[in-house]
Amino acid sequence: QDQVYASNFGEGICIHDLETGERRPTVKQDAVDILRVVDALDNIHIYNRAIGPQDVPSQSASMHNAEVAFCYTSKPMHLVSGSPFQTRKMIKMAEIAAGGKEELKRRPRTAFNHTTISPLRVSEEACENAMIVAEAGLPNHILVMVQQGATSPISYAGSVAVHNADFLAFNTLLQCVNKGNPTLYGASACVMDMKKGLSLVAAPEVFVLNAAMARMSKYY
C-alpha cells in the first residue's frame, strides 16, 4: 500500500545529555527515556532500538534493548539479536508480551533486523538468527547497506542491482526455511566520500538510491 510509516533511528553509542549539555556514552536509561518520547508521538509508528547502552555488557546489550522495548511500548518494533541464543529468548519475550505464541503469529508486532555484508555476502550468524525467526513465523527485516563507490558500483543502476541481489539471496534462504514468511525489504544506502574516505549518510545521492530501492520493493 502507498502509505508512509516512520520510525526513529538507531543505534547511537553517544548522546548529548539534556541535563548537562555534555556528550557522553549512552546508558540503558537513555533507551527508556527515548522510548517514552517515541511511544507518545503519533507521527512515529515503529520503534527501532535507539541506542546501544554502554553501561551493560556488550554481549547482552541487545537483550537489554529488547527488555526496554517490550516494557515501554505497544507499538510495532524492530529488534536486533546478538546471537541465536538471544534470538530464541527474544521470541519468547515477544510471545509473552503478545499473550501467547498463536496470538503473536496472528498479529506480529516484532520484526528482527539482519544486515548483509555487501557485496553479496551474509554472515553465518545473521543467517542462523534469521532462520530461527522464519521458523517461528515472525517477520525478518533484511537491511542492505550498500556504499555507492565502495561496496557497490558508482552508478545508480549498479548500486541498485547489488542491493537487490543481496536482498534476494538472503530472502531465498528464508523462504526455503518457511515459504511465504513475511520479509521486509530494507534499504540504508550511503555514498563513499572519495576524498576523505567517509560514508555519507545524508548526501543527495543517498535519497535517490533509497527511493529507487523503495520502488524495487514494490515490484516484489
PLM feature segments, named:
Residues 3, 8-43:
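A generic, well-ordered mixed alpha/beta core segment in the N-terminal half of proteins
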Residues 26-220:
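Helix-rich catalytic cores of soluble enzyme domains
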Residues 1-4, 20-21, 92, 120-123:
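Proteins with a high burden of low-complexity, intrinsically disordered sequence enriched in S/T/G/P/A and R
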